[in-house]
């Protein structure tokens, strides 16, 4: 499938690697801009950019997508599907409606639980017994789209959020590669999120 990938940090880079390995046509990559890092403030590329350039894939780093400045370029790229993993920019309706199969997002929680940022850290801080990954069909809301697929992941009470995140990343990359061909085959049934399960939890204080 011809995919436009949007993502920035390590988890996105691992997902992008998995899509390359699965043989998908990554027509281009959108990521955030290079940032100064460390005491010497060395300008550093996002992990996703490094992976894309290593594969010879065009990389775009606009400040925003919301002003419509990238609409024409995205249409010209003619993606069948846009895959978003921790990109960091909001996709406007004009972008969401461009691909044949729309836009999907990998979120590292069992939606609708822990919508928004840092879901793995929240799960650990709150002492949850499990977390998971969800892949949703994106709409104009924040993590509000219909869920295409989810997979539960047990949390070891002794593991750190970093250790759990590594496991979640591996599962997320695998599930993403399973979902893409299923989308093309039309074998997935989008499920609306159960709004009764939405809650905002405060982290548990630990001594």
Enumerate the predicted regions with their spans.
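N-terminal Rossmann-like dinucleotide-binding module
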Residues: 1-40
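Amphipathic, non-transmembrane alpha-helical secondary structure
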Residues: 13, 17-21, 72-75, 93, ...
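Donor/substrate-binding cores of folate-linked one-carbon enzymes
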Residues: 22, 81-196
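A generic structural signal for well-ordered alpha-helical segments
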Residues: 19, 52-57, 128
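Structural motif corresponding to alpha-helix initiation and N-cap regions
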Residues: 13, 42-45, 67-71, 89, ...
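Internal alpha/beta domain cores that form substrate/cofactor-binding pockets in large enzymes
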Residues: 2-4, 27-29, 58-77, 82, ...
């Amino acid at each position: 499938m011809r995919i436009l990938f949007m993502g920035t940090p390590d988890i996105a880079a691992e997902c992008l690697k998995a899509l390359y390995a699965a043989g998908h046509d990554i027509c281009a990559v959108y990521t955030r801009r290079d940032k100064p890092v460390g005491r010497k403030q060395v300008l550093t590329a996002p992990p996703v950019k490094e992976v894309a350039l290593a594969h010879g894939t065009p990389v775009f780093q606009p400040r925003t997508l919301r002003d419509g400045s990238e609409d024409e370029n995205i249409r010209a790229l003619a993606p069948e599907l846009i895959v978003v993993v921790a990109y960091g920019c909001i996709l406007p309706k004009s972008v969401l409606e461009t691909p044949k199969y729309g836009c999907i997002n990998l979120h590292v929680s069992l939606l609708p639980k822990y919508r928004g940022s840092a879901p793995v850290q929240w799960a650990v801080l709150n002492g949850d017994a499990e977390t998971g990954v969800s892949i949703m069909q994106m709409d104009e809301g924040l993590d509000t789209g219909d869920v295409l697929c989810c997979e539960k992941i047990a949390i070891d009470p002794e593991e750190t959020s970093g250790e759990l995140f590594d496991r979640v990343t591996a599962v997320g990359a695998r599930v993403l590669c399973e979902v893409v061909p299923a989308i093309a085959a039309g074998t997935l049934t989008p499920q609306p999120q159960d709004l009764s399960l939405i809650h905002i939890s405060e982290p548990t204080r630990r001594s």
